[in-house]
Amino acid sequence: MRRIFLLTVIYLFTFSAIQAQDESPYLLINKSDESLAEGITKIKSALSESGFKILGEYSPAQSEKLAVVCYTHPKLEEIALNFSDRGALASALKVGLKKEGETLKISMTNPMYMFYAYFVDGVDEQEMALRSISDQAIKAMKNIGTMEVPFGGTLEKKKLQKYHYKVMMPYFTDAEELKTFDSFDEGLKTIQQNLKAGKGETEKVYELVYTDKEVAVWGVALKNVEDGEAHFLPIIGDEHVAAMPYEIILQGNTASILPGKYRIALHWPELTMGTFMKIMSTPGDIKTTMEKLTE
């Protein structure tokens, strides 16, 4: 009986610790004097050799000093598709690179931060599997560097699951619907064709299509100089470059995005209201751009 009691106490203590654990949106992995190209090659190799699938890469804001590598894992895709409220958005993880003078900084989105925010309800049942994927990704990046320094702020699991920037600001569940098509196939074809044509000054970074589930996700480069990445990243901070690219998701016959006021704040949780006001038009600009992909 004493043994059972002790095991119960240990379990409850461990569970409480997990519940209260702070997560940062990013981990700084390495600093070196390598080029962007060398860094990208090493990242792709390290992830591929650890069982991850490379989805795509690009230069945010069309900058020669910035790059992002997007990747996923088969188990993550499987789990994400079980979350009906846009869970597939969490399928793509990202590594960011920034060349600052002679120094190349490599950082990654913290997988658990994103999982807690995007999976919302029901994450507890998959937490061990998700933690395993997160640990595997971080371990893979140790082939690049061993710094593993959290940055970008901290939030507890419980707050991430119900995250919003301020009162009256949107939550994850307040996704913005862009268009309802007659069918999934029509929506898929329309968005694919528009991305191929670069409509709205966009470019496809990656694409995930699950035809049997009628779900598709795209990472989209926002290339308009006046209201795209080149406009807002320098203002809110390109140290968080791994936040990009922005996503559009097609579920069933409905295309939607996460509201800019939610997604930007989630990836820049330390952003002051003063700085946020400087990009006041950005959430609307992003929505307008993404809508063009559905027309």
Briefly describe each language-model feature range:
Residues 4-16:
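Sec-dependent N-terminal signal peptides
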Residues 21-62, 120, 142-215:
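Terminal, regulation- and interaction-focused segments at domain boundaries
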Residues 65-108:
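Mid-chain, structured segments of secreted extracytoplasmic proteins
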Residues 76-81, 115-118, 225-231:
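Short, cysteine-centered beta-strand-loop-beta hairpins and adjacent loop/turn segments enriched
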Residues 95-115, 250-268:
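Beta-strand/loop substructures that line and gate deep hydrophobic ligand-binding cavities in soluble
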Residues 106-149:
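Hydrophobic alpha-helical segments and helix pairs
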Residues 206-295:
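A cross-kingdom marker for long, charged
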